[in-house]
Amino acid sequence: KKKNAAFEFCEADYFLAYRDDKIVGRVAAIINNQANKKWECKNVRFGWIDFIDDPEVSSALIKTVEEWGKERGMTHIAGPLGFTDFDAEGMLIEGFDQLSTMGTIYNYPYYPIHMEKLGFEKDADWVEYKIYIPDAITDKHKRISELIQRKYNLKIKKYTSGRKIAKDYGQKIFELMNEAYSPLYGYSPLTQRQIDQYVKMYLPILDLRMVTLITDANDELVCVGISMPSLAEALQKSNGRLLPLGWFYLLKALFMK
């Protein structure tokens, strides 16, 4: 809890389901007080939920979260959700044969069936798209880009140093995210401590060739584009472990393409 800045405004407990001394399920119960205040609700969140294909297990996990929330004055339950939008969210309902990105949740097809039987209804849709990038940018798109840059006096900025981009724009990047993400489902703004953590966690490992900043006439940051290689295949090869060779697969996916 000391390491996770989200505990400045969140509280949580974690539960395991056992049968015959074997773990058959898990779930986190979370209250994001900041999000509840912003969205004027009293939601307890369930997150990081996993269970075997047994309704008794899934029901026990959800009921445990419900009771935990009721004891703390909550009136509704929602999930899967993490502490913030930077945690994995949602439940896969189609595309089970597709390889997802690292930041999304994969679950077996029986998961949403269990949720429906427990009385849950869909509250929001998240859609993941695959966009194919052309080998070369067309002249038309180049002309449009140049026209917009001239019209609004925009400047494109690229960096080659993670420390330099963190120093110059680390704070501003996450302030812009707070503003842009504000209307999104369940979003709660990042605190200063969270911003400091994310700047240290993410900016040093980004391939800066795939990071683009756009500033206006006053040198204010108005847009940021961050792309990252998928680590899904690397995590499969490493079996989710850094040793003995997991670190190599991850570094190769990040920087060697």
Predicted features along the sequence, with ranges:
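Conserved beta-strand positions that form and line the central face of beta-propeller blades
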Residues: R45, K155, L213
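A conserved beta-strand-loop-helix scaffold within acyl/acetyltransferase catalytic domains
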Residues: K1-D21, V27-K38, K158-K257
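Acyl-donor binding region in acyl/amide transferases
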Residues: K37-G119, A124, S238-K257
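A general structural signal for short secondary-structure junctions and capping/turn motifs
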Residues: A6-E8, W68-K70, L118-E121, E146-I148, ...
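Acyltransferase donor/substrate-recognition loop-hinge adjacent to the catalytic core
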Residues: I105-G186, M210, C223
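A short, polar/charged loop/turn motif at coil->beta-strand junctions and beta-hairpin connectors
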Residues: E11, I23, E40, D123, ...
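Feature marks short, surface-exposed loop/turn motifs that line or immediately flank catalytic pockets
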Residues: N33, F83-D87, D135, L231-E233
